[in-house]
Amino acid sequence: MEKGTEALNSKVDKFQRATPNTVLVDSILLPSKLKLALTTLIFVIVLLIGLGNPGGILAQEASEDSGLEDALSGFDDEASADEDDALSGFDDGTDESGSAEDTDATEEEASWKQAFSGFSGSTGFSASYSFAKEAPADATQADWSGLTKLRPYFSLTWDAKLGENWKTRISGKAFYDFAYGMKDRETFSEEVLSELEKEAELREFYLEGSPFGSLDIKLGKQIVAWGVANSLRVVDVLNPTDSREFGMTDLEDVRLPIAMTKLDYYLGDFKLEAVAVHQIEFNKSPPFGSDYNPSTQVITEVIQESSSENTEYGLALIGTFSGWDASLHWAQYYDDSAHFKITKITVIPGVGAVPTLEQRHSRLTMGGATLSIPSGNFLWKAEAAKLQGMEFALVTDKTFARTDALVGTEYSGWSDTSLTLEFGVQHINDFDVTLEASPDSQLEDRIATTVSFMQDYINQTLHLSMFGMMIGKSGQDGGLNRMSLEYDVMDAFSVTGGVMLYQTGDNAYFQSLNENDRLFFDARYSF
């Protein structure tokens, strides 16, 4: 099956696509000194807020006691026995009828309450404003400056128990973006309007239960998150991701649920996990014409059919021990990130050889392991994996293997604060320098470093989140930075605002994001 999709001038690897909330490096469009001063000023203001006396939050709990009075019984003692006998039959019938009706009504009310108690969700709207990009001089071109998103959204989840050992979940989400209608809508590509203007989709939809004590089974659309890393992906290969707005979403929110069968067998300190992925679905990439897609042409993406022959498989042995955890992982799957394949070359006079490209997905085999060790206020973690079967456009006579490794730590010794550092490297074994040229644009070693800082203020109602990622030993291949503040107006209502800055570098894709710096805002009501 073929699907029309966009081609990126430079493929962004999984280290770059699995990016969460971010922030603190300079973008290119504003002068670096000004950006550094702006970021520092914001950070200092937030810290001053945190050092002040926190405000108090009063919580009130109310309870009501209600009861039913016993029905008054007894009639006039002076009434004749005949009257009592005659009336007693009607009284008994009335009591039985009333009692049955009350019981049925109570059971029906309890049933409705139980059904609706499983519903949860959120609604709100999100907005973003691109302050670095200028409006195009040509009015026929899409305008990605200024307001780029004004999106009301709604999500709903239903959880229900089915007997003692089974439960189900059904969730979905929908949005509509008014920003395109507020500009010249016809200047945006069909792909952008189709994928970014509106969406309604079913997300998680599964049945989960335990046929007997040591075995759990989960059937349906679900997410299986492997690994111990927060922001970089090594052994976490089963679920595709949504990277249409690169870097704007946390890793836990960016995974896409797909149809799987998962079996978990428990034996002492170990869990053996077996997964069969029935639905072949790949990453949601920025559509052609998006400000996150610099491609000038649409390139066909070849997508494998969801069939028994193309089923993906995964195995994991997870051990939870006293003082440390470890796991072993194996998977045979299709790479969620596409590679280019040259299908033909056309020689154009005065231009030269012009290749015709397709996007393909390689069948990969992964073997890996993870380790996490808590030590005081630190949590040390590591992941490593070897991927085999990688294909590229410029070297077609063999496949390649790649070794991925990650080390990181989380520190939680400060009150209401967490700090996370992660360092990852991808090494292509037996590297061929031919792969450095376009369209492959590969490096023998690709390094990524991430820093995440989160802190709560004012009785945990104000939440600061900062994230920074750099690609390359010193960020020479690009990076991104994001800072946000979330305030809980009340228990169920929160507002969030922040700034996103992209750092350019030698990588062509990050160079294309140079003018994508933006402010963002979100208001959310949860129920």
Summary of predicted features, one role per range:
Residues 55-167, 171, 179-180, 194, ...:
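N-terminal periplasmic/intermembrane-space "pro-region" immediately following the signal or transit peptide
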Residues 125, 152-160, 170, 204-209, ...:
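Residues on the lipid-exposed face of transmembrane beta-strands in outer-membrane beta-barrel proteins
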Residues 125-133, 174-178, 223-225, 267-269, ...:
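Transmembrane beta-strands of outer-membrane beta-barrel pores
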Residues 164, 331, 372-392, 396-470:
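Detector for outer-membrane/organellar transmembrane beta-barrel domains
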Residues 164-293, 322, 502-504:
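Outer membrane beta-barrel
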Residues 165-168, 214-217, 269-272, 323-326, ...:
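Repeated loop/turn-to-beta-strand initiation elements of outer-membrane beta-barrel proteins
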Residues 243, 267, 501, 513-527:
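Outer-membrane beta-barrel "beta-signal"
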